[in-house]
Amino acid sequence: HAAVSAKLAGKILRDLKYDNATRKDVVELIAHHNDILLPDPVNVRRALARLGEVQTRRLVQVKVADLIAHDLAGEREKILTLFAEISDVIDEVVARGDCTSVKALAIGGQDMMALGLSGRAIGQMLNAALELVLEKPEMNTRETLLNWVRGNLENCQK
């Protein structure tokens, strides 16, 4: 239902002559409004990797509003507490500077080429390294990631 809602919202916003940036942001939030957000650093890093900091914070607000609007059991305080905890974890992850993008990895495309990778294999390996770092941020050091890549070269098509 999220994909259909996002597509419909995009059309409505276009008909209402909203600017492209606003349309993109709103459609993205609607498309992700069913994503599971937890007060867990790994979950938060994944959301930040998917959406970026601004959109992740907006998504928290959208989810709070959505859940409170559907709150049939009178759980408003629990909902607000949960999303305050999620916001705190976002603050902690951002303050620590945890890696949440390929660009922020301690290695890059040049390192992959030096190891013999080319084309799509570079992106695949960097994305796999990001997945590792989202789970274990302490792995985001040049030497650790290069060793990890060397150990996983056979899993990647050069």
Where do the model's predicted regions map?
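Divalent metal-dependent catalytic cores for phosphoryl transfer on phosphate-bearing substrates
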Residues: 1-84
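Charged substrate- and nucleic-acid-binding regions of tRNA-handling and nucleotidyl-transfer enzymes
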Residues: 9-17, 71-158
